[in-house]
Amino acid sequence: MEKLARKQVQALTPYLSARRIGGSGDVWLNANESPFDNEYNVNFTRLNRYSECQPPELINAYAAYAKVTAEQVLTSRGADEGIELLIRAFCEPNEDAILYCPPTYGMYSISAETIGVETKTIPLTSEWQLDLPSIERNLDNVKLVFVCSPNNPTGNVINRKDILSLLEMTKDRAIVVMDEAYIDFCMEVSTVDLLATYPNLAILRTLSKAFALAGLRCGFTLANKELIDVLSKVIAPYPVPVPVADIATQALSEAGLARMKYQMLDLSANRAYLHAGLMVLNGVTVHEGWGNYLLVQFSDGDAVFKAAWDHGIILRNSPIKDCVRISVGNREECEKTLGFIRNQLM
């Protein structure tokens, strides 16, 4: 069967999500999930009917939250589908390319490789910022430039002046895609205000992180109407199931937003607790981050990751040497993780 697959697919290494990697334990801090399991009222009386392609109540609710117009919003099955839609809509297979800046989210390259679109990589600088001169030298045939901010796994925010420079250098050449999956934790640095100035800007959002709805698979692409109209040509006819739209709309209601903001305060306190406890340990460097996770460097990160794994504390190893990414869980999970690491390093 393998030989019947397309050559690009035969050569493809699938994205190793936290769930694919697996593990066995009672502390799961490897997927940047929220520890809050919120309840929703779900209407199961309309499941014999197809959902609307873009449910108006959901679109209007997210537009209000994001402070954009409804025509600037497209909802999809997670932000991952938004990545795929952008590549399918704007990149010619075996002709065009995307560009991204590692270390960063791995689905940009996999989504491109799946359909035969070249990937160009320009590593982030030593301070995990954009290497603008190198990006500019490598823009030939590039249709999409993916920038994650706050970046996963490093946690830092990309300098706004560099984003502006990137938008300027790609005018009439390429679309800059800002992946803002973690922006709810630092909305003040969102690039959403730049949509008014730059038609070559697209923004990816999700309900998986701050809204505690990773299992719902609901994401959004924000852009100007002309770009949204192009994406609408390639999206599936019924991308958002009825229960998903119902739950997401509830999460974006006044009560839902109040709960989300309260829970973010709790997560912020837990992140500060974890950060303070780790940074005083010998041989440990905690990198400043803005999301619901911390990138932590040890003298031997692989050893810490494996020891925690064997102890039932599931963290995420990192492509960055000796670094482990730790999601911020509830206080009990953070205490257990910190206590284990402290004992491990003694």
From Swiss-Prot:
Q: Which reaction does it catalyse?
A: L-histidinol phosphate + 2-oxoglutarate = 3-(imidazol-4-yl)-2-oxopropyl phosphate + L-glutamate
One GO MF term attached to the UniProt entry = histidinol-phosphate transaminase activity
Keyword Amino-acid biosynthesis recorded: yes
Record-linked Pfam families: Aminotran_1_2
Give GO BP annotations, semicolon-separated: L-histidine biosynthetic process
Positions of post-translational N6-(pyridoxal phosphate)lysine modification: 209
Give the enzyme's main class according to its UniProt record, as a single word.
transferase
Q: Which UniProt keywords apply?
A: Amino-acid biosynthesis, Aminotransferase, Histidine biosynthesis, Pyridoxal phosphate, Transferase
Cofactor(s) needed = pyridoxal 5'-phosphate
Superkingdom in the source lineage: Bacteria
Q: Which pathway does it take part in?
A: Amino-acid biosynthesis; L-histidine biosynthesis; L-histidine from 5-phospho-alpha-D-ribose 1-diphosphate: step 7/9
What's the Enzyme Commission number for this chain? 2.6.1.9
Gene3D superfamilies assigned to the protein according to its UniProt record, in alphabetical order:
Aspartate Aminotransferase, domain 1 (3.90.1150.10), Type I PLP-dependent aspartate aminotransferase-like (Major domain) (3.40.640.10)
Q: How is the subunit organization of this protein annotated in UniProt?
A: Homodimer.
The family classification in the record reads: Belongs to the class-II pyridoxal-phosphate-dependent aminotransferase family. Histidinol-phosphate aminotransferase subfamily.
- PANTHER family found in the cross-reference section: HISTIDINOL-PHOSPHATE AMINOTRANSFERASE (PTHR42885:SF2), HISTIDINOL-PHOSPHATE AMINOTRANSFERASE-RELATED (PTHR42885)
Could you identify this protein by its name?
Histidinol-phosphate aminotransferase
Query: Native species of this protein?
Result: Aliivibrio salmonicida (strain LFI1238)
The encoding gene is hisC
